[in-house]
Amino acid sequence: MEQNEREKKGAGAPNSAKAIVEALLFAAGDEGLSLSQIAAVLEVSELEAKAVIEELQQDCRREERGIQLVELGGVFLLATKKEHAPYLKKLVEAPGASPLSQAALETLAIIAYRQPITRAEIEEIRGVKSDKPLQTLMARALIKEVGRAEGTGRPILYGTTPEFLDYFGLKTLEELPPLPEWADDGESEREADLFFEKLAENLSDGQPEYGKLKKNG
């Protein structure tokens, strides 16, 4: 009886379970979900949850699917396929594409200069949540997951992509303009704001025409 009830709620209906897992992973975004989290939501064993995940992975491998289900450091998440990168690049560089917001520029600048870096570290520097800017930058293929940090939860590490270099007319990261000195002994809120303004200015200089960033000095 208990087994029947569990099947009604979870993996007893494979198609429904796959759809639920896909929805969960979409909602989780770039943080993804662990096997235990997925199993808990489906109210099934981890073995049953893994079977559903594997079926969904197989579905995503079909040519007509634009996303893939990947496992990174024990966490499952949805990601675009590498073969679609040229089209994502076109989206970024399209004349009608909306410019990056100030929040996205700040986040991108921090990643560019501090990579590899976690979301928590980005938010510590910015002082605000950075989920939406990260999602925007991931969607535009300007940043990517480059690994997992050590420690509790093994958070995702972010880094820039080749598309980032193309977007700002750079050949390598070494061509990034030098930053103003950043003191570690604490600064006023105004000085922190100026720091971010400088970062955004450095990056946005190349934004309209995707030209080379200006170097200081």
Swiss-Prot record:
<keyword id="KW-0131">Cell cycle</keyword>
<dbReference type="GO" id="GO:0051304">
    <property type="term" value="P:chromosome separation"/>
</dbReference>
<keyword id="KW-0963">Cytoplasm</keyword>
<dbReference type="GO" id="GO:0005737">
    <property type="term" value="C:cytoplasm"/>
</dbReference>
<keyword id="KW-0159">Chromosome partition</keyword>
<dbReference type="Pfam" id="PF04079">
    <property type="entry name" value="SMC_ScpB"/>
</dbReference>
<dbReference type="InterPro" id="IPR036388">
    <property type="entry name" value="WH-like_DNA-bd_sf"/>
</dbReference>
<dbReference type="InterPro" id="IPR036390">
    <property type="entry name" value="WH_DNA-bd_sf"/>
</dbReference>
<keyword id="KW-0132">Cell division</keyword>
<comment type="subunit">
    <text>Homodimer. Homodimerization may be required to stabilize the binding of ScpA to the Smc head domains. Component of a cohesin-like complex composed of ScpA, ScpB and the Smc homodimer, in which ScpA and ScpB bind to the head domain of Smc. The presence of the three proteins is required for the association of the complex with DNA.</text>
</comment>
<dbReference type="InterPro" id="IPR005234">
    <property type="entry name" value="ScpB_csome_segregation"/>
</dbReference>
<comment type="function">
    <text>Participates in chromosomal partition during cell division. May act via the formation of a condensin-like complex containing Smc and ScpA that pull DNA away from mid-cell into both cell halves.</text>
</comment>
<dbReference type="GO" id="GO:0006260">
    <property type="term" value="P:DNA replication"/>
</dbReference>
<comment type="similarity">
    <text>Belongs to the ScpB family.</text>
</comment>
<protein>
    <recommendedName>
        <fullName>Segregation and condensation protein B</fullName>
    </recommendedName>
</protein>
<dbReference type="GO" id="GO:0051301">
    <property type="term" value="P:cell division"/>
</dbReference>
